[in-house]
Amino acid sequence: MIKDPFERLGLDREVLTVSQLNGRARVLLEDVFRSVWVEGEISNLARPASGHMYFTLKDSGAQIRCALFRQNALRVRQALRDGLAVRVRGKVSLFEGRGDYQLILDTVEPAGDGALRLAFEALKEKLGAEGLFSTERKRPLPAHPQRIGIITSPTGAVIRDIISVFRRRAPQVELNLIPTAVQGREAINQIVRALQMADRQGFDALILARGGGSLEDLWCFNEEAVARAVAACVTPIVSAVGHETDVSISDFVADVRAPTPSAAAELLAPDSSGLQQRLDSLQRRLLLRMQSRLAHDRLRVEGLARRLRHPGERLRQQAQRLDDLDMRLRRAFALNMNQRHERLGRLDTRLAAQHPGRSLKLLKQRLDSLAERLPKAMRDVLKDRRQRFQAQLQTLQVVSPLATLARGYSILLDEHGQAIRSAAQTHNGQRLTARLNEGELKVRVEDNHQTPVTLSLLD
C-alpha cells in the first residue's frame, strides 16, 4: 500500500509542468492498477474506422471512460451496445493530452442476466438452425389421454395445481409423477433422466412444469442437454415453465407451450361436463338417424315384398335360361371347331408348298444346268485369253529393242552399262560396248564431235 505517493515521487517541493504531472500520474495509476475487473453498463459507444472501441462504463453513481483497442476488440464474441451490462478487465491509465482518467481494456464479457440472455439467444439460434423448433416436428396432443406423466418437483404449488385441474375436469385420467429438481446445476441431469424414463413408460402425454422465478432460477430449462432430451422424446410434451411472460428453450422444443402449469393441465384434461353434453347430443343424433334408417328400410322391404315372385316360377325361368345358354354354347363350340379345321387346311397347303423336297429338286436342276455350261464357258475363256496374249506378244516384239538389233542396228553402252544416246556423252579414247543382234563388240571413241562419231575396234 502506498502511504505517501507524493513523497515517493518527489512532488512535495518540485514544481511540475502539466505534462510532467499527467505523465507521473499515469505511471502511478498503471503501476497500482495493473489489472482490475469492473462491472457496469455501456453508454456512448463509439466505433471509429480504426476498429477500436470507445465507451463510458457507468453505474448509478459514477462513470469512467474505457478504450478497447482493435486487437482486443476482435476477441469479443458478443455484440456490444449501449445499455448492455458487462464485466471488463483492464489497467487504469491516464490520457496525458486531456488529463482524462480511463480504463485500457483487454477483456469484455456480459454480466449477470446479460450473459444469460446472450447464451439464451445463442442456443436458440443454434437449435433453430437444426430444425428443432420447426412445426413439422410438433406432434398433436391426444384428445382423450388416459395416462399422463408429470415431470416436476414433488413439492410446491405446481403439482398441486395440476392435480386439482385434473380432479375437476377429468378425474378418470391416471396421473404419474416423475420427481426431479427444477433449479440448480443438479437439476439438469435429473430432468434429462426423468424425460428419458418417462418416455419409456408408454404415457399418452408428458407435462414438463415449474413455477415462476428469475432467469437464473429457470435456467436449467434453457440448457442444451434438456432441450435435446425434450426433442428426443417420442411422447408428446407440453412445456409449462414459469409464468406467462417467461419463455424457455424447452418451450420452443416441446410440442406445445402452456403459459402456466395449470394451463398445461387444462390442455390435456378434457372437460367432463363438456364431454357429457357432447355424448348426449351424439346420442340424440344417433337415435334420430336410427329411426330414419328403420323407416327407410321398412319402405324398402315392403317394395321388395311386392316384387317378390314364387320360387317355382323363378326356377323355371332359370331352367329356360340354362337351356338357352346350353344351345348357344353348343353352336359356338361347333363354329369354333369348323373355323379351326379350315385354318388347319390352309396351314397344311402352305406347308406342302414349303416342303424341302421341292426346293431341293429345283436346286438340283439348276446345278445340272450349270455343270453342263461350265466346260464350254471355260474353253471360251481360255480361247479369248490366248488370242489376247498373242496380240500383246506381237506388240511387244514390235517395240522390243531386240527387234531393232535384228534389223542391223546396235546399242552403245558405256562402262557402267548405260545406253549412249548422244555424242556429248562420250570422249575421245573412251571404251564402249556395242551390243549387236548376235554378240557384242568392244570399241573405242576416235572422234566425238556432234557429227557422226568415229569408232575403232579394239584389238
Curated annotation (Swiss-Prot):
Organism lineage string: Bacteria, Pseudomonadati, Pseudomonadota, Gammaproteobacteria, Pseudomonadales
Role: Bidirectionally degrades single-stranded DNA into large acid-insoluble oligonucleotides, which are then degraded further into small acid-soluble oligonucleotides.
Protein name: Exodeoxyribonuclease 7 large subunit
Reactions listed under catalytic activity: Exonucleolytic cleavage in either 5'- to 3'- or 3'- to 5'-direction to yield nucleoside 5'-phosphates
Enzyme class: hydrolase
PANTHER family hit by this protein: EXODEOXYRIBONUCLEASE 7 LARGE SUBUNIT
Naturally occurring in which organism (per UniProt): Pseudomonas entomophila (strain L48)
Residues spanning the signal sequence: none
EC number, UniProt record: 3.1.11.6
Keyword Nuclease attributed: yes
Annotated keywords: Cytoplasm, Exonuclease, Hydrolase, Nuclease
Entry-linked Gene3D superfamilies: 2.40.50.1010
Domain of life: Bacteria
Subcellular location: Cytoplasm
Coiled-coil regions listed in the entry: none
Keyword Nuclease on entry: yes
Gene this protein is translated from: xseA
Family: Belongs to the XseA family.
Cited InterPro entries: Exonuc_VII_L, Exonuc_VII_lsu_C, OB-fold_nuc-bd_dom
GO cellular component: cytoplasm; exodeoxyribonuclease VII complex
Subunit annotation: Heterooligomer composed of large and small subunits.
